[in-house]
From Swiss-Prot:
Classification via SMART domains: GARS_A, GARS_C
GO molecular function: ATP binding; metal ion binding; phosphoribosylamine-glycine ligase activity
Family of this protein: Belongs to the GARS family.
EC code(s) of this entry: 6.3.4.13
Positions of the ATP-grasp domain: 109-324
Protein known as: Phosphoribosylamine--glycine ligase
Residues annotated to bind Mn(2+) 2: E294, N296
Amino-acid positions noted as binding Mg(2+) 2 in the UniProt annotation, renumbered to this chain: E294, N296
Gene: purD
Length: 444
C-alpha cells in the first residue's frame, strides 16, 4: 500500500509513525529538509519544497500512490490537494477553496457571519490602512475592548499580535497594523478582532466532506517561557487527559464547541464544496462559553503528537474514510490515557533563533524513559543533527494519569544537548490548577 506523505515536521513524523503501524504501508515522503525520524521509516524520499506543486506532481507520477496525506498548511494553500485529487489519488487534506478556513482569516470570519455560527466575535477586515481601521479600533477602545491584529493570510503562526501581550495598547495596535500593510505580512490584508479573555483549548476532527468525528480535547501552550510568559510561539507543548476532556472544560462547553465545528463543516460545504481532511479548532473558553479564535486546515502541532499515539483505530483506515467520505463506517477509538508533549526549541526562538547549530540527542535514554521522540525542524547532514531556527524536537509521555505522563516527558526532555531550551511546566499540576482557577474566576 503506497502512501505519499507531504511535509517534514514533527506533525508529519507523528502522521508517518501512525501510518506505519499498518505493516502494509510503504511510505513515500516529500519534504524540504532531512527529518531523521521520517527518513528512517520512509521507503523513498523526495527532497523538495512542500509548496513545489510540479515537484509533487512529478513524485506522485513516479511512485503512483494509492493514498496521499498532506501535513502542513502551505501545500494546501497552493492547491496540492486539488492536484492530487485530479490525478485520481484519494487525498487527505482539503482542496484550496475549503482550506481557506485557515489560509484566509477573512473567509473564516465572513463564513461565521453569513451562516450565523455560534462562537463568533466582533471583527472587521481591511485591505488598506486608513481612517476606517483607526475608527474601528477607537470604537473597540470606547467599549473597553482590547484588540488582536491578524494578517489575513498565512504567517506560520507568528503574525498575530495581541494587545496586552505583544502590543502595549490599542494605539500600538494601529502602529502594528500599518506595519503589516507596509511590509505585506501575510499577504497584506488585515483582520482586527476583539481580544477574547479566558482559557484556550483545541479540538480536532476527522472530516470526510460531510461527517466530522471528534478526537480528545487538548490544551496547547503557545507562550515561550514557564508560567505562560514571553512571546507567542507555534506551541511549546500540550497535554490531554484520560477522559478525553480537560480539567477546566465541562461536558456542556465541550458539546458547544463540537456543535460550532459541526456547523462550520456544513457551512464550508455549502459555500465552497466538501472539506476532506483534518480540522483543528482553536477555542477560547470565555465567560460566555467557547469562542473560536481560528481554524487550521490540518493537524495541530504539537497536538498531533498527543492524539495520534493513542489512536487505537487503524490510521490508514481512517485516512481512506476521510478521502472517500466513509467516516460513518469507522469505529473511532482512542486509548483512555493521558499524554504530555514538550518541545525543545532553539535559543532565541521565536524572535531571533540560533540556526545551523548541532543538536545531540540521546535516543536510547528517551526510549528508556518510555517516551516517544518526534523530530521537527531538524536537518541531518553527515550523520549529525542541526537545528534550523524553528522548533527542533518533541517528546511525549503517555500514562494512566497526567502526573505520570508529565514525569515521563520531563525525564525524556533532559536528553537533548545544544543551544536549545524548553518549558518544564507543561502538564504539571500547578499549571493545570491555574487554568481551573481562571475558569472559576470567569464564572463570577
Amino acid at each position: 500500500m503506497k502512501v505519499l506523505l507531504i511535509g517534514g515536521g514533527a506533525r508529519e513524523h507523528a502522521i508517518a509513525m501512525a501510518l506505519k503501524k499498518n505493516e502494509l504501508v510503504e511510505l513515500y515522503t516529500l519534504m524540504k529538509n532531512k527529518n531523521p525520524g521520517i527518513y528512517a521509516i520512509s521507503d523513498e524520499v523526495s527532497f523538495n519544497s512542500e509548496t513545489d506543486v510540479p515537484a509533487i506532481k512529478e513524485f506522485a507520477e513516479k511512485i503512483k500512490p494509492e493514498l496521499a496525506v498532506i501535513g502542513p498548511e502551505a501545500p494546501l494553500g497552493v492547491g496540492a490537494a486539488d492536484l492530487l485529487i485530479e490525478m485520481g489519488i484519494p487525498t487527505v487534506g482539503p482542496k484550496k477553496l475549503p482550506a481557506q478556513i485557515e489560509t484566509s482569516k477573512e473567509f473564516m470570519r465572513n463564513l461565521f457571519k453569513k451562516y450565523e455560527i455560534d462562537g463568533s466575535l466582533r471583527y472587521a477586515a481591511f485591505n488598506e490602512y486608513g481612517n476606517d481601521l483607526e475608527t474601528f479600533i477607537d470604537e473597540m477602545t470606547s467599549l473597553g475592548k482590547d484588540v488582536v491584529v491578524k494578517p489575513a493570510g498565512l504567517t506560520g503562526g507568528k503574525g498575530v499580535k495581541v494587545v496586552g501581550e505583544q502590543l502595549k495598547d490599542n494605539e500600538e495596535a494601529k502602529i502594528y497594523a500599518k506595519e503589516v500593510f507596509d511590509k505585506s505580512i501575510g499577504g497584506g490584508n488585515i483582520i482586527i478582532e476583539e481580544k477574547l479573555v479566558g482559557v484556550e483549548f483545541t479540538l480536532h476532527g476527522f472530516v470526510d466532506g460531510e461527517n466530522i468525528v471528534f478526537m480528545p480535547a487538548v490544551q496547547d501552550h503557545p507562550h515561550a517561557y514557564n508560567n505562560d510568559e514571553g512571546p507567542i510561539t507555534g506551541g511549546m507543548g500540550s497535554y490531554s487527559c484520560p477522559n478525553h476532556g480537560l480539567p477546566f472544560l465541562s461536558a456542556e462547553m465541550l458539546d458547544r464547541a463540537e456543535k460550532i465545528m459541526e456547523k462550520t463543516v456544513s457551512s464550508i460545504n455549502s459555500e465552497v464544496g466538501p472539506y476532506n481532511g483534518f480540522l483543528y479548532g482553536q477555542f477560547m473558553l470565555t465567560a460566555d462559553g467557547p469562542k473560536i479564535i481560528e481554524y487550521n486546515a490540518r493537524f495541530g502541532d504539537p497536538e498531533a503528537m498527543n492524539l495520534l499515539p493513542i489512536l487505537k483505530t487503524d490510521f490508514l483506515d481512517v485516512c481512506f474514510a476521510i478521502a472517500e467520505g466513509k467516516l460513518d463506517k469507522i469505529n473511532l477509538e482512542f486509548e483512555n490515557k493521558a499524554t504530555v508533549c514538550k518541545y525543545v526549541v532553539p535559543n532565541g526562538y521565536p524572535i531571533d533563533p540560533v540556526r545551523n547549530k548541532e543538536l545531540t540527542v540521546d535516543e536510547k535514554a528517551i526510549e528508556n524513559a518510555d517516551a516517544i521522540l518526534f523530530y521537527a525542524s531538524i536537518n541531518e547532514k553527515n550523520g549529525k543533527l542541526y537545528i534550523t531556527g524553528s522548533r527542533s524536537a518533541a517528546v511525549v509521555g503517555i500514562s494512566e494519569n497526567i502526573e505520570e505522563a508529565e514525569k515521563i516527558a520531563q525525564m525524556a526532555i533532559e536528553n537533548f544537548k545544544g543551544e536549545v531550551y524548553y518549558r518544564s511546566d507543561i502538564g504539571t499540576l500547578g499549571l493545570i490548577k491555574k487554568r481551573i482557577e481562571r475558569v472559576k474566576q470567569l464564572a463570577k
